[in-house]
């Protein structure tokens, strides 16, 4: 049980880049689709007999505003989305704008957290 808690602690502390690498490893080496794993985990509580609403599995990350630290937000968008500097700046300047579309919940929340830490106002749709 202690091992499982240690693994959970490590997962919670992963950076966005590490989460992306983990998803790639799970997919390429073990054939596990990250979205499929999330669905399997989400389905388990419903199996206990509780009437659960269907959870949304695909999210759009929307940058509502860059806030006061626009440069930091541009850097964060550039790093997180793999864009060039000009593309990242244009995306931030066009706020409100969609940063990423159709991503799983974990990726969306990690991206939202990274952008908010840079000073942006972000929402998930």
Swiss-Prot record:
Q: Does the keyword Ribosomal protein apply?
A: yes
Fetch the Pfam families from UniProt: Ribosomal_L12, Ribosomal_L12_N
The family database entries (InterPro entries) matched by this protein are listed as: Ribosomal_bL12, Ribosomal_bL12_C, Ribosomal_bL12_C/ClpS-like, Ribosomal_bL12_oligo, Ribosomal_bL12_oligo_N_sf
SUPFAM superfamilies, alphabetically? Answer: ClpS-like, Ribosomal protein L7/12, oligomerisation (N-terminal) domain
The protein's matches in HAMAP family, at most eight in alphabetical order, are given as: Ribosomal_bL12
Q: Which family does it belong to?
A: Belongs to the bacterial ribosomal protein bL12 family.
Q: What is this protein called?
A: Large ribosomal subunit protein bL12
Tell me the classification of the organism that encodes this protein.
Bacteria, Pseudomonadati, Bacteroidota, Bacteroidia, Bacteroidales
